[in-house]
Amino acid sequence: MRKKTKNTNNTYTKKISFVPVILMLAVVPLILRWHVTQLDGPIARFWIGTYETNLYTYAKSIVIIILTIIMATFSFLTIKKETIKKDKTLKLVLIGSCVFIGFSIFSTILSDHKDIAIWGAPERREGLVLHLCYILMFLYTYLVYQDKEDFRYIKYPLIFLSVVMGLIGLSQILGKDILNMDFMNDIMMPNEYKDVFTPQNTGGSVYLTLMHSNYVGSYASIIMSFFAVLTLSNHESTPMRIIYGAIFVFTGIILINANSQAGIVGVGVSMLALFIIYSKKIFKSKKLVTALLLFVLATVSITNIVTKGLLLDNTIDIFVDAKKVLVKDPNHKYDPTYGLPVYDVKASKSLATIYTKDGELNIYFKNATDLQFTDSNKKPVEAIYNKDQKNYKFAPPFQKLMLLESSESSQEFSQIAVYYEDFTYYIIEYTKEEGAYLIDSQGYRYENMIAPHMGFESSERAGSMRGYIWSRTLPLIAKNPI
């Protein structure tokens, strides 16, 4: 009797240990809650405004931290040391995890901005704390899910998540976003902020509950890979395999409508891996090969029709980007302007020079409000000043350029915004004591410089500008490897 009671208690304990993972898989991705954070320090220096409004990530990160603490507590109370000692694979995983954690902590200690390093920047919130959570979540899941029967506690939460995300995605594709409905306003918005909620018009693009379509790509590639394996598994019943296949196809439609090239590449690579793994079984039967080819062709054709050609367009774009990355254009010449109509401003003392695709415009400050204009050849440029609107407009070739004075301008101080076709590019500030210099939208002085870059020549726009990001990130890593 005691043995039965003990086994029953162990069963309950084991089932309870699955709960944090189930919540992490089925609930956390769906969490949306409006949160306002007042910014200070270096974050306020580079952020637009002194407040961050966050709907997608702040609440998720808080729940992740709470669930990770629960996981750590369960691990301490229930997992035996003998289990860890006997598992050779786990030992290797622990070594790798400790190396990652060690470098992360060391990097945080060396950081000049420890608050950002620890808690992360606005919107993402992925600093040291969340990275530690990710590692602990991974280790906990590995330790808790030991038997084949335990797999259902991963499978069913992901089915639930996929269905809910699928409904949200469908509503966004149809332009009837569920997240814009009144009942969602009640869930997402605290009482004091309910009046500031405005429905989002995404134009039919898909972002689910993940803030951006690129994150939809990451989500979809994981879900599709997972359910593709289950669809091909002989250990699952036929009705369930049909459900898995339906989730795979429907998630694929959402992925295509999200226009995430990274997600499509991820799915493509995982499907290639699956093909290699199952190739022996597939090629044993000609009927199976024929059936598989027909299934793939039908799925691709239907998906392309449903998405109105987006699948084909995205696939072509991926190959074009891949060619740019793998094959350097021999005719490519580095252009620091990147085709911007206004690409630089140099300011010092009584002179500011605006560099545009139409030529160079020099501004001479006699004082803060008495300006004279010349071109690169020092020839005068005709300018018309509107006293009511406090702006300067110019004769050709600078007719698309406009300078707008701030309402606080005087003979000793002025701020001038540089517009090109109604878009602001730079702000010039002038004081009697210091002359002319550039300021950002927060009012901080800076000098406009070309960022050092490394690699990705002619392919900087590949993968949603990831080529540009990496080409500017690599020099930073080389300078600060830890």
Regions found by a protein language model. Give the residues of each.
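Juxtamembrane membrane-water interface segments that cap and precede transmembrane helices
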Residues: Q38-T57, S111-A117, E192-T209, Y468
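Membrane-interfacial, low-structure loops and terminal tails that flank and connect transmembrane helices
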Residues: M1-T11, K81-L90
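TM-adjacent membrane-interface loops and short helices in multi-pass inner/ER membrane proteins
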Residues: H212, P341-N391, A395-P397, E405-E412, ...
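Non-cytosolic membrane-interface motifs at loop->transmembrane helix junctions
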Residues: A117-L128
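Transmembrane alpha-helical insertion/packing segments
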Residues: A26, L39-W47, L90-W119
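Membrane-interface coil-to-helix junctions
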Residues: W34, P42-S61, I95, L132, ...
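Alpha-helical transmembrane segments of multi-pass inner-membrane proteins
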Residues: R2-L32, K60-F76, G96-S111, L128-Y140, ...
